[in-house]
């Protein structure tokens, strides 16, 4: 998915190809689903065992933030945006939190990381505050709520923000959560049948 995103974004940028641009967003959607699929068991393990979330956050941020900030500084220097107001919007990942929030979108590919960072920052805390044992019911409920919100905003915001807005793409990560949960349940259910043959 990562290579697909990079290739499609590059092709769309160089040749101004609208088809490749839409294809790049599809790959990003799949990337979000894959991210949720991979991180779901890690997060659920932390929640069920009531472990400190600091370890979860630390591991995630070590993998993503150093390279992000390095590239942000490099791009901002090259585009004369270092320490500008827009630069700090990228620092706090709020550049796509609302339409037209940023004047100079000098680091446009950062929108996808903003979605992931806000999701993994707030979603575990929400689940912990609800303090429920069956987290999957809450996850499915939130997923449907996000889909309804996304449908509501479909005709109210311009198309580019609809595809890249931080709080309009969170549903894809939850889809990965749900897929992993039900695949896990199916495998657990089939295991006794396999051993019984």
Give, region by region, the residue ranges found by the protein language model.
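Interfacial loop-to-helix transition and helix-capping segments at the boundaries
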Residues: 16-28, 102-115, 155-175, 194
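Hydrophobic transmembrane alpha-helices
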Residues: 13, 37-45, 71, 75, ...
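Lipid-exposed faces of alpha-helical membrane segments in multi-pass integral membrane proteins
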Residues: 3-7, 33, 70-74, 88-91, ...
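Functionally critical transmembrane alpha-helices in membrane proteins and complexes, commonly lining
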Residues: 1-45, 65-68, 94-95, 105, ...
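Transmembrane alpha-helical segments and their boundary/interface "anchor" motifs
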Residues: 25-28, 32-34, 39, 43-78, ...
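Solvent-exposed interhelical
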Residues: 117-146, 180-195
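Extracytosolic (periplasmic/ER-lumenal) interhelical loops and adjacent juxtamembrane/interface segments
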Residues: 87-101
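Aromatic-anchored segments of alpha-helical transmembrane domains
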Residues: 3-11, 77, 96-98, 142-154, ...
């Amino acid at each position: 998915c990562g290579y697909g995103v990079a290739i499609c974004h590059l092709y769309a940028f160089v040749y101004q190809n609208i088809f490749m641009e839409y294809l790049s967003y599809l790959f990003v959607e799949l990337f979000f689903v894959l991210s949720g699929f991979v991180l779901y068991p890690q997060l659920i393990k932390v929640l069920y065992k009531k472990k400190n979330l600091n370890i979860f956050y630390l591991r995630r941020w070590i993998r993503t933030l150093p390279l992000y900030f390095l590239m942000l500084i490099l791009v901002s220097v090259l585009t004369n945006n270092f320490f500008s107001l827009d630069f700090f919007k990228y620092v706090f990942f709020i550049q796509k939190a609302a339409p037209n929030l940023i004047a100079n979108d000098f680091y446009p590919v950062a929108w996808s990381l903003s979605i992931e960072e806000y999701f993994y920052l707030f979603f575990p805390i929400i689940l912990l505050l609800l303090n429920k044992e069956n987290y999957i019911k809450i996850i499915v409920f939130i997923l449907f709520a996000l889909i309804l919100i996304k449908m509501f905003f479909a005709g109210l915001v311009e198309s580019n923000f609809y595809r890249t807005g931080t709080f309009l793409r969170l549903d894809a990560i939850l889809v990965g959560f749900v897929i992993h949960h039900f695949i896990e349940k199916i495998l657990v259910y089939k295991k006794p049948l396999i051993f019984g043959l």
